């Protein structure tokens, strides 16, 4: 076998007849498969052992030679070679066709490659190939046109008119083959290039297409006549198996039926030709043979598909490759693996961050070979066979061995759907009883797991390298930050939040207030014995906590705090300030001075002068974790998280929060608020009946009134709530629920959406405490159903979006340290109207500067060029009043097939500079796709006159942007830079005209009457600026402005959608995707290069082609940038393997074969497909020479040996 890891590239071409013969081990002459009595393959049939190899290892068909010692001998009795049965997966046969047959991919594809080569229409080709018309091949001296079609009658008439042999006309694939042989590629190409100089319109488009195909044949060395088959390869029998079912019947692959039809028809044709049968019968048989081969290659592409039993269309060779169940996606990109298991998950609150609980019986099965090796090593058993029996019997001694084996051997846990890289993490296994996997509660957020019956899969990394990578790169304790935004992903939730919230509450006048303790232990003792309450404010000696970063003025004093906060601060990392207040100042700058007693001061006096602090909420805990990570990195953070979790669980149990109906408060003035709203609605309806407002206005006014009523109730609820109310505590701490849930319980449910998405005017006035009436209940079912269907649709849509994103960016890898570009991107805060969607500070963090940044007033250099901007530096730049900064960006990176470290910046998942080899494309795709399910599905209907457009938001808008579609509610943009001089309204056409005066001339733009204007007379506008509200069409913007403007616009638009839904995503991820959409240019004028006009090519390839021409003093080619949607960009990738495994498999392969494309295996998918280690991370060439050394050399028993011995 070829060593996959030594592959440099992979090429696909058309196979010549001689090539097909060289593959073949013999001709399949009979349609038989296996003998019904002996069940042995028939000679010269589709499963023949002589052609394809033996069905049993090292055994010929007749049984004369058995055993491996006869390896390579060809049996003199049956003619079968003694070898492994595995060769039946690789040996091919062939069928000699008695008449040429056209290949349906090349004749039927769009555009038809045969048609373009011959300059004939697909319809004409079809008539010839399927024997409906003759085609003139050589008119000789007659006035007939070459390639003209003649019907049967016309052909006879012409023969009589000009005499037999005066011209050559044929039908069928044979005629096409003759025509293809006559094509003079060089002459045709020269002629077309000449024609292009003057052609325009449709004629030019057709010439460019033909030139493309002919040039492909010319350059690849493929001959056009190979598109017609004279010999048909037969794929190996094990790839179209026939298996016996329990009832003695056989199940066979559809391909066998399709091959059988071809062989039957071919043999019948051979017999007819021998008998010199009448032409019409032969013709009919040839047509049937053509149809049989068509069905074998792509059943159903032309006419009705051939069906099997139950009128089910048979699966042809093309179907074996296509779609989710095809070869590419089912077997090459995703494989089933051994050493894996799956079970329901349960919570493991006692586990450490890096541990998971694995049921004993699962672990013994997963680690079986390792356990068996240890049994033999310890001499509990003499050989592997005995060891295997010992494990299967469940001998007592195996459990101790299992404990040893799993120590330090990480396992991988995966939860489907794996939306981002945190969907697979490594843990150290801990053996547990029971049958469920135990999962650490803090990693649930990364997996999006809960314990209502979710299942997870477990995998065992086997090799030393795999174990090392799992431990160093994938251990759950290492994954503190989310790759999408660099924020902690392991924030505590629910009980943990609630426990810490309860612990850090403060209360005035509780027992023990004003007591002073010498240290933590004394305070805890007082609390345990009932002398002090958890929430009572007490004093503690600062010197009992010497490791905290106190100011000098604070040492040796007494500090006012609560018993709960003493416990809370006890689990904090030592160098973190003592936390009294849930704010950033306390966290970063230290404990405020007001909590410290001056000598001789009365503690009660200080306590009375202090405000009651709010407890620590979920958000505050997140900030503490982020700060801890920033200062101490992963090890300390994960240990701290475990302490935080334990403390939270312990105290949420102690708090004993319960919820009863009495905990839902009653709002005293609810009736008044609702009566006022009813009164206002009545007035609005009255005004409408009098004709003072339109129906749209009335609808908006009514819905607004009810919305305001609901808000008034909500406001009243917040004002009157008791902070110790359990529901309020849950809501306020961020443990569960929000104000909207609370107001539905205690206020009113409010307005509901109708099935059509429009909001109904009748609100639900009741709340859940009072209970809903039957009608109200009925109304609310619409919303509930819509919620369910939306979620289901959204999940599928979001998953497909992620798949397309991954596909377009999977080959973007950090390939070098610095690309040395001199370009940069000028960034400022992203705004939407007056609202800031993303601040400059957020955009600067973790990026490199392109130019030095100076203080706008003093001129002092804040940071030099090409320096990394840290979080603190970003704050400093913004505080200095800088509004825009030029940074290194993925958009301007000059690295080929990837990005350099400096243009990318920091890796958000680690907080450090990104490493060479990081697969940033895939991470970007996951970061954008994973929150896709959180985005809404709706297209908002803004009822009312305000706008006549539907503003697309949420997931549909993201798809619109990435697919570069024309947006709904498109804005009119100006092509002129200048001033708006006039806006005139034309009532007759219901439009407005906007006039922009530029330096070179006046621009006139027609705008719909109802569109909302963004500009006024006198405004200065730049090229590409929007005159009306709405989304700009990016392709139009590209025509008016440059690539960078389009990239910046798309980046801002994506961020607006995500930020409006409260989802934060790092700019760099969007940059990676947008850059992939703009990586191609279209050649306009080839100049002196040998490029073809109209060709799509990578910018780097285009630059290379021009470089040589410019050096030699020729005219360089000109091009225009092209914006492609992600689906099209994926299909236009340089890798045909990646494109074929994505979509439109047959089209991609047809095209690649004609061009003789070479895949240089630069991306991830291509390497996964051929089974090579991916060129990212540790698989990158620069890291491949490192030899891992095990601490103690250990051998792992091969499974095949075990099964061989067991037999």
UniProtKB/Swiss-Prot annotation:
The reaction(s) this protein catalyses: RNA(n) + a ribonucleoside 5'-triphosphate = RNA(n+1) + diphosphate
Annotated positions binding Zn(2+) 2: 819, 893, 900, 903
Example of a GO biological process term: DNA-templated transcription
EC number, UniProt record: 2.7.7.6
Pfam families from the UniProt entry: RNA_pol_Rpb1_1, RNA_pol_Rpb1_2, RNA_pol_Rpb1_3, RNA_pol_Rpb1_4, RNA_pol_Rpb1_5
Alphabetized UniProt keyword annotations: DNA-directed RNA polymerase, Magnesium, Metal-binding, Nucleotidyltransferase, Transcription, Transferase, Zinc
Enzyme class, UniProt record, top EC level: transferase
InterPro entries: DNA-dir_RpoC_beta_prime (IPR045867), DNA-dir_RpoC_beta_prime_bact (IPR012754), RNA_pol_asu (IPR000722), RNA_pol_N (IPR006592), RNA_pol_Rpb1_1 (IPR007080), RNA_pol_Rpb1_3 (IPR007066), RNA_pol_Rpb1_3_sf (IPR042102), RNA_pol_Rpb1_4 (IPR007083)
Binding site for Zn(2+) 1: 60, 62, 75, 78
Co-factor note (free text): Binds 1 Mg(2+) ion per subunit. Binds 2 Zn(2+) ions per subunit.
GO molecular function: DNA binding; DNA-directed RNA polymerase activity; magnesium ion binding; zinc ion binding
Domain of life of the source: Bacteria
Sites where the protein binds Mg(2+): 450, 452, 454
Subunit organization: The RNAP catalytic core consists of 2 alpha, 1 beta, 1 beta' and 1 omega subunit. When a sigma factor is associated with the core the holoenzyme is formed, which can initiate transcription.
Family recorded in the similarity comment: Belongs to the RNA polymerase beta' chain family.
Function: DNA-dependent RNA polymerase catalyzes the transcription of DNA into RNA using the four ribonucleoside triphosphates as substrates.
Record's protein name: DNA-directed RNA polymerase subunit beta'
Organism: Streptococcus pyogenes serotype M12 (strain MGAS2096)
Lineage, highest ranks first: Bacteria, Bacillati, Bacillota, Bacilli, Lactobacillales
Gene expressing this chain: rpoC
């Amino acid at each position: 076998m070829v060593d996959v890891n030594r592959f440099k590239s992979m090429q696909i071409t058309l196979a010549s007849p001689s090539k097909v013969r060289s593959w073949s081990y013999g001709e399949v002459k009979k349609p038989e498969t296996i003998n019904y009595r002996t069940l042995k393959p028939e000679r010269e049939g589709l499963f023949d052992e002589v052609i394809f190899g033996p069905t049993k290892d090292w055994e010929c068909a007749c049984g004369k030679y058995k055993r491996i010692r006869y390896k390579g001998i060809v049996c003199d009795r049956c003619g079968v070679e003694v070898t492994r049965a595995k060769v039946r997966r690789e040996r091919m046969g062939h069928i000699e066709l008695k008449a040429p047959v056209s290949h349906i991919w090349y004749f039927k594809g769009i555009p038809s490659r045969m048609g373009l080569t011959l300059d004939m229409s697909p319809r004409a080709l079809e008539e010839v190939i399927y024997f409906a018309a003759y085609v003139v091949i050589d008119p000789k001296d007659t006035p007939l046109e070459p390639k003209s079609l003649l019907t049967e009658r016309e052909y006879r008439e012409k023969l009589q008119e000009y005499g037999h042999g005066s011209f050559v006309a044929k039908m069928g694939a044979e005629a096409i083959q003759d025509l293809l042989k006559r094509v003079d590629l060089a002459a045709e190409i020269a002629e077309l290039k000449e024609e292009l100089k003057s052609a325009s319109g449709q004629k030019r488009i057709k010439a460019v297409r033909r030139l493309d195909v002919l040039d492909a044949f010319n350059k690849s060395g493929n001959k056009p006549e190979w598109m017609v088959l004279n010999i048909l390869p037969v794929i190996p029998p094990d790839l179209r198996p026939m298996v016996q079912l329990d009832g003695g019947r056989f199940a066979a692959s559809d391909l066998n039926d399709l091959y059988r039809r071809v062989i039957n028809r071919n043999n019948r044709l051979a017999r007819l030709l021998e008998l010199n049968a009448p032409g019409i019968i032969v013709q009919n048989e040839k047509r049937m043979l053509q149809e049989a081969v068509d069905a074998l290659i792509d059943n159903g592409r032309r006419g009705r598909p051939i069906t099997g039993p139950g009128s089910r269309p048979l699966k042809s060779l093309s179907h074996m490759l296509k779609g989710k169940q095809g070869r590419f996606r089912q077997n090459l990109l995703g494989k089933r693996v051994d050493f894996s298991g799956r079970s329901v998950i349960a919570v493991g609150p006692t586990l450490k961050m890096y541990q998971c609980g694995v049921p004993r019986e699962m672990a013994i099965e997963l680690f079986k070979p390792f356990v068996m090796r240890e049994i033999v090593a310890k001499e509990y058993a003499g050989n592997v066979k005995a060891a295997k029996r010992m494990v299967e019997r469940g001998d007592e001694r195996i459990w101790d061995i299992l404990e040893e084996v799993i120590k330090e051997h990480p396992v991988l846990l995966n939860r489907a759907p794996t939306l981002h890289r945190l969907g697979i993490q490594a843990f150290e296994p801990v053996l547990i009883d029971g049958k469920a996997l135990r999962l650490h509660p803090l990693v649930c957020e990364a997996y999006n797991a809960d314990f209502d019956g979710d299942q997870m899969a477990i995998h065992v990394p086997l090799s030393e390298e795999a174990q090392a990578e799992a431990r160093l790169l994938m251990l759950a304790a290492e994954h503190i930050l989310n790759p999408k935004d660099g924020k902690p992903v392991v924030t505590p939730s629910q009980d943990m939040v609630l426990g810490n919230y309860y612990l850090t509450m403060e209360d005035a006048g509780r027992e023990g207030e004003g007591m002073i303790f010498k240290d933590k232990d004394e305070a805890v003792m007082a609390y345990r014995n009932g002398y002090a309450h958890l929430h009572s404010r007490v004093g503690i000696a600062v010197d009992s906590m010497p490791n905290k970063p106190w100011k000098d003025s604070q040492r040796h004093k007494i500090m006012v705090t609560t018993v709960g906060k003493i416990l809370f601060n006890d689990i904090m990392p030592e160098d973190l300030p003592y936390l009294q207040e849930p704010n950033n100042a306390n966290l970063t700058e230290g404990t405020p001075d007001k909590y410290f007693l001056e000598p001789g001061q009365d503690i009660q006096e200080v306590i009375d002068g202090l405000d009651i602090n709010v407890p620590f909420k979920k958000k505050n805990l997140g900030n503490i974790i982020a700060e801890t990570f920033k200062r101490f990195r992963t090890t300390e953070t994960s240990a701290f998280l475990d302490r935080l979790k334990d403390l939270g669980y312990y105290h949420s149990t102690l708090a004993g929060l319960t919820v009863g109906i009495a905990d839902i408060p009653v709002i005293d003035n609810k009736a008044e608020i609702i009566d006022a709203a009813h009164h206002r609605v009545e007035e609005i309806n009255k005004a409408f009946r009098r004709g003072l407002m339109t129906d749209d206005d009335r609808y908006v006014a009514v819905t607004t009134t009810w919305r305001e009523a609901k808000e008034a109730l909500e406001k009243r609820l917040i004002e009157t709530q008791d902070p110790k109310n359990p529901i309020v505590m849950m809501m306020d701490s961020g443990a569960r629920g929000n104000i909207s849930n609370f107001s539905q319980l205690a206020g009113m449910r409010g307005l509901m959406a109708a099935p059509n998405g429009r909001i109904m005017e009748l609100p639900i006035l009741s709340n859940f405490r009072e209970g809903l009436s039957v009608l109200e209940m009925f109304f609310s079912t619409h919303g509930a159903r819509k919620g369910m269907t939306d979620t289901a649709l959204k999940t599928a849509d979001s998953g497909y979006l992620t798949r397309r994103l991954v596909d377009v960016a999977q080959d973007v890898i950090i390939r070098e340290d610095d690309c040395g570009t001199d370009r940069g991107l000028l960034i400022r805060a992203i705004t939407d109207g007056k609202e800031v969607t993303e601040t400059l500070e957020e955009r600067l963090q973790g990026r490199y500067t392109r130019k030095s940044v100076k203080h706008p007033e003093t001129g002092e250099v804040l940071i030099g060029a090409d320096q990394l901007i840290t979080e603190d530096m970003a704050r400093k730049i913004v505080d200095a009043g800088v509004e825009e900064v030029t940074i290194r960006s993925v958009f301007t990176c000059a690295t080929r097939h990837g990005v350099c470290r400096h243009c990318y910046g920091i890796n958000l998942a680690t907080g450090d500079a990104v490493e060479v080899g990081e697969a940033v494309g895939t991470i970007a795709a996951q970061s954008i796709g994973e929150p896709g399910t959180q985005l809404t599905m709706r297209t908002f209907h803004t009822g009312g006159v305000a706008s006549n457009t539907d503003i697309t938001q949420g997931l549909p808008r993201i798809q619109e942007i990435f697919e570069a579609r024309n947006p709904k509610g498109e804005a009119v943009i100006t092509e002129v830079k200048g001033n708006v001089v006039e806006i005139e309204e034309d009532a007759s056409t219901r439009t407005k005209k906007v006039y922009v005066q530029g330096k070179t001339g006046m621009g006139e733009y027609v705008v719909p009457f109802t569109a909302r204007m963004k500009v006024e007379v006198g405004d200065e506008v730049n090229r590409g600026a929007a005159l009306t509200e709405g989304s700009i069409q990016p392709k139009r913007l590209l025509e008016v402005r440059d690539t960078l403007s389009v990239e910046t616009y798309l980046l801002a638009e994506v961020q607006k959608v995500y930020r409006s839904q409260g989802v934060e995503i790092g700019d760099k991820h969007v940059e990676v995707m947008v850059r992939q959409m703009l990586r191609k240019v279209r050649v306009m004028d080839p100049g002196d290069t040998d490029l073809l006009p109209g060709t799509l090519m990578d910018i780097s390839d285009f630059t290379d082609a021009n470089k040589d021409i410019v050096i030699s003093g020729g005219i360089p080619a000109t091009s225009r940038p092209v914006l492609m949607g992600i689906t099209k960009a994926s299909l236009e990738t340089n890798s045909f393997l990646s494109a074929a495994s994505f979509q439109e498999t047959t089209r991609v392969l047809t095209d690649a074969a004609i061009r003789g494309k070479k895949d240089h295996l630069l991306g991830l998918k291509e390497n996964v497909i051929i089974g090579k280690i991916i060129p990212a991370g540790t698989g990158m060439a620069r890291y491949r020479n490192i030899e891992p050394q095990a601490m103690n050399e250990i051998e792992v028993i091969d499974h095949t040996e075990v099964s061989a011995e067991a037999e």
